[in-house]
Amino acid sequence: MERAIFAGGCFWCMVQPFEELDGIVSVRSGYTGGHVPNPSYEQVCSKTTGHTEAVEIIFDPQKIDYSDLVELYWQQTDPTDAFGQFEDRGDNYRPVIFYFDERQKEIAEQSRENLQLSGRFQDPIVTQIEEAQPFYLAEDYHQAFYRKNPERYAQSSKQRHDFLEENWH
């Protein structure tokens, strides 16, 4: 099994698209990239930990390639917004692809370059590609939030949904 970590705004909205793919073992919400060990949601929201909300994906590389996950990642985000995603603002919502090895780094960088050259977006692609840091699981109530709270999930993801429909579908 291999790991991938993606940050694309509120982690609630990043779980379902990946969970639905064949070859995915698990998708868990959490925090990474900061300097405070085992942060709470409240600490991360205070913007004092350096962490960003992210999802950790465990996948079977015999069934799905990392490059496929990166392509799906782009389609869940606004890669031109470095200061958060949609209605979620601040460093704790910044878009980042975290890599575990040189292969993942190269795939992510090439994919970002291809997206920039595609002309899909007029603004520069600003999503960061950074070395993976320790990943801390979010509290249980955040896990699989879209299944536990479908109405709240739909409300919180409307702006994202509208952007994705307009720019990716």
UniProtKB/Swiss-Prot annotation:
For this entry, list what GO says about its biological process: protein modification process
Name the job this protein performs: Has an important function as a repair enzyme for proteins that have been inactivated by oxidation. Catalyzes the reversible oxidation-reduction of methionine sulfoxide in proteins to methionine.
Protein name per its UniProtKB record: Peptide methionine sulfoxide reductase MsrA
Please give one Gene Ontology molecular function term for this protein: peptide-methionine (S)-S-oxide reductase activity
Active site, per annotation: 10
> Where does the secretion signal sit in this chain?
none
**Which HAMAP family does this UniProt record tie to the protein?**
MsrA
Q: Which organism is it from?
A: Streptococcus uberis (strain ATCC BAA-854 / 0140J)
* The EC number(s) this enzyme carries: 1.8.4.11
Q: Which Pfam families match?
A: PMSR
Keyword field contains Phosphoprotein? no
**Keywords of this protein's UniProt record, alphabetized?**
Oxidoreductase
| Cross-referenced InterPro entries | Met_Sox_Rdtase_MsrA_dom (IPR002569), Met_Sox_Rdtase_MsrA_sf (IPR036509)
Its catalytic activity? L-methionyl-[protein] + [thioredoxin]-disulfide + H2O = L-methionyl-(S)-S-oxide-[protein] + [thioredoxin]-dithiol; [thioredoxin]-disulfide + L-methionine + H2O = L-methionine (S)-S-oxide + [thioredoxin]-dithiol
Which protein family is it in? Belongs to the MsrA Met sulfoxide reductase family.
